[in-house]
Curated annotation (Swiss-Prot):
Gene3D superfamilies reported for this sequence: q2cbj1_9rhob like domain, Rabenosyn, Rab binding domain
Classification lineage: Bacteria, Pseudomonadati, Pseudomonadota, Gammaproteobacteria, Enterobacterales
GO MF term (any one): iron ion binding
Descriptive protein name: PKHD-type hydroxylase YbiX
Keywords, sorted A to Z: Dioxygenase, Iron, Metal-binding, Oxidoreductase, Vitamin C
InterPro entries: Oxoglu/Fe-dep_dioxygenase_dom, PKHD_C, PKHD_hydroxylase, Pro_4_hyd_alph, Pro_4_hyd_alph_FE2OG_OXY
Cofactor-binding details, from the entry: Binds 1 Fe(2+) ion per subunit.
Enzyme Commission number(s) from the entry: 1.14.11.-
Start and end residues of each Fe2OG dioxygenase domain: 78-177
SMART domains: P4Hc
A Gene Ontology BP annotation from the UniProt entry: DNA damage response
Membrane-spanning segments: none
């Protein structure tokens, strides 16, 4: 399943990020991809050795960790270190699949269950640059407001179309979920959303408590910690 997570960064945060990224050191984006991806990748990424990068990636991690909808949809166990990319002058990233595992500074290795793109450019400021994701439900084309995030299964083939005008800047990362199976994770998310909706409409009652008990028992049954 694909999820739109709005408002991960405020407009003020986005403006500050963009101002700082104007001063960043950018390198060839192929430095962080495997052999297959390198053949179809043509973009730039912030140099991960820079002091600015260390500060910005920490801010992204803090923002997603504090976002309730992101947590409910992803049920994250491990987040990769966020990266930042830039597309301009017809740069693109052809169809590819993300690696199944990635190195992680704390855990050593992590499984990539979900991929996330946090948009940092106003969609009206550039042409092209759509994230195109192919999954079992068809093809999805994504171009979100700055500060919003899209979450999708890392098993999906995806690409970024050429940016023919302006500049597309984003942060991206991978998530190992507590729930490995996409279908089970989607069911838990739907159950959680409906519990929250019922609570806001009717307040606490025995039926809602019973549903909440069901949610946590399923999470206990399916989670890998």
């Amino acid at each position: 399943m694909m999820y739109h997570i709005p408002g991960v960064l405020s407009p003020q945060d986005v403006a500050r990020f963009r101002e700082q990224l104007e001063q960043a050191e950018w390198v060839d984006g192929r430095v962080t991809t495997g052999a297959q991806g390198a053949q179809v990748k043509n973009n730039q990424q912030v140099d991960t050795r820079s002091t600015l990068y260390a500060a910005l990636q920490n801010e992204v991690l803090n923002a997603v960790n504090q976002h309730a909808l992101f947590f409910a949809a992803a049920l994250p166990r491990t987040l990769s270190t966020p990266l930042f990319n830039r597309y301009q002058n017809n740069e693109t990233y052809g169809f590819h699949v993300d690696g199944a595992v990635r190195s992680h500074p704390q855990s050593g290795w992590m499984r990539t269950d979900l991929s996330a793109t946090l948009f940092l450019s106003d969609p009206q400021s550039y042409d092209g640059g759509e994230l195109v994701v192919n999954d079992t439900f068809g093809q999805h084309r994504v171009k979100l407001p700055a500060g919003d995030l899209v979450l999708y299964p890392s098993s999906s083939l995806h690409c970024v179309t050429p940016v023919t005008r302006g500049v597309r800047v984003a942060s991206f990362m991978w998530i190992q979920s507590m729930i490995r199976d996409d279908k089970k994770r989607a069911m838990l998310f739907e159950l959680d959303k409906n519990i929250q909706s019922l609570k806001s409409r009717y307040g606490e009652n025995e039926e809602i408590l019973s549903l909440l008990n069901l949610y946590h028992n399923l999470l206990r049954e399916w989670s890998e910690i």
